Amino acid sequence: MVSFTSIVTAVVALAGSALAIPAPDGNMTGFPFEQLMRRQSTPSSTGRHNGYYYSWWTDGASPVQYQNGNGGSYSVQWQSGGNFVGGKGWMPGGSKSITYSGTFNPVNNGNAYLCIYGWTQNPLVEYYILENYGEYNPGNSAQSRGTLQAAGGTYTLHESTRVNQPSIEGTRTFQQYWAIRQQKRNSGTVNTGEFFQAWERAGMRMGNHNYMIVATEGYRSAGNSNINVQTPA
């Protein structure tokens, strides 16, 4: 959730603008503009849909629409402005063979992720298994922890610390783990247990699993995704 906020400085020079409705004088923080963005966005929510757990969060700073579809499917359409993350999966998460497919189209290769995303508690950890991403590679601003050969590809492992940032437990300081696929793809099968074990071997301790979803995340970009989680709920 809100993972991009830790890399705003690095991203701002890269982030493109694709606003459908420009803010007066380019100011995106005015009250009328903020209200307009919120009216055009799907409100944050969590719950169950067709047996799957879903999580949807947006900071309300961009027009973004999230829709749950049949089975394990969902879609997201977004435009420039803020941060969002959402998708379908399981509560609790854990070691699972996840098969997914779909489309992931950030406009102009903008800042966005297609990933397996989740949290653990005790310790509090936010983790990403990145399958595809736009122009920004989050590993560039995190500490390297080695590589993993898995799911027919190579993943680089990384770790960073988030200080006093939003989490599933409120504002906390916690670790953020990454596994970033070098051969980007929009479909495939991921055995999450392989990644959890690789992180543990690298000294990156996992906790008790909270939710885990096949997620789309975006920050100051535009695009669309249509994802189908094929692994049963």
UniProtKB/Swiss-Prot annotation:
Segments forming domain GH11: 40-230
Compartment(s): Secreted
S-S bonds: none
EC category name: hydrolase
UniProt similarity note: Belongs to the glycosyl hydrolase 11 (cellulase G) family.
Pathway: Glycan degradation; xylan degradation
Identification of the protein by name: Endo-1,4-beta-xylanase 1
Signal sequence interval, chain numbering: 1-20
Keyword vocabulary terms for this entry: Carbohydrate metabolism, Glycoprotein, Glycosidase, Hydrolase, Polysaccharide degradation, Secreted, Signal, Xylan degradation
Entry's induction text: Expressed in presence of rice cell walls or on oat spelt xylan, but not when grown on sucrose.
Record has Secreted as a keyword: yes
Stored Gene3D superfamilies: 2.60.120.180
Pfam families named among the record's database cross-references: Glyco_hydro_11 (PF00457)
Protein task: Endo-1,4-beta-xylanase involved in the hydrolysis of xylan, a major structural heterogeneous polysaccharide found in plant biomass representing the second most abundant polysaccharide in the biosphere, after cellulose. Accounts for approximately 70 percent of the endoxylanase activity in the culture filtrate.
Active site location: E126 (nucleophile), E217 (proton donor)
EC number(s) recorded for this UniProt protein: 3.2.1.8
